Amino acid sequence: MTASATRKLIDRYYAAFNAQDTDTMLDCLGTGFVHDVSQGERRKGKKRFAEFLAHMHKCYHEQLSDIAVMTSTDGARAAAEFKLEGRYLATDEGLPPAAGQTYRLTVGAFFEIEDGKITRVSTHYSLPDWTRQVIG
């Protein structure tokens, strides 16, 4: 896969995220997909990721902006940094109570690509910063 094709794949993935289009996000993912979150558990497989997205859509409304995507020359890896703006809609287990609070975070993500699909995404953000923002 070329660097240009990888960039288009990541752009499609994040456009689907902003549209809350789970089907398109899942279509961007390859066999054996793995989702790592710096502040949470590892999820293996599209089914687990779809369950995660459903939970996220219930508890949060989030939009990404200022997305900067970088790719390796062979297109096998990519990284992205972006601004995430969100609203906390429903209390998530183990987190402060939700009351429609807004928050803004800088997030980084790293991707592995095989056969034109994302096989791993690792997302990194500051949970302490998010907590400070929603507690007030």
Task: Describe the function of each predicted region.
Residues 1-136:
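C-terminal and inter-domain tail/linker signature
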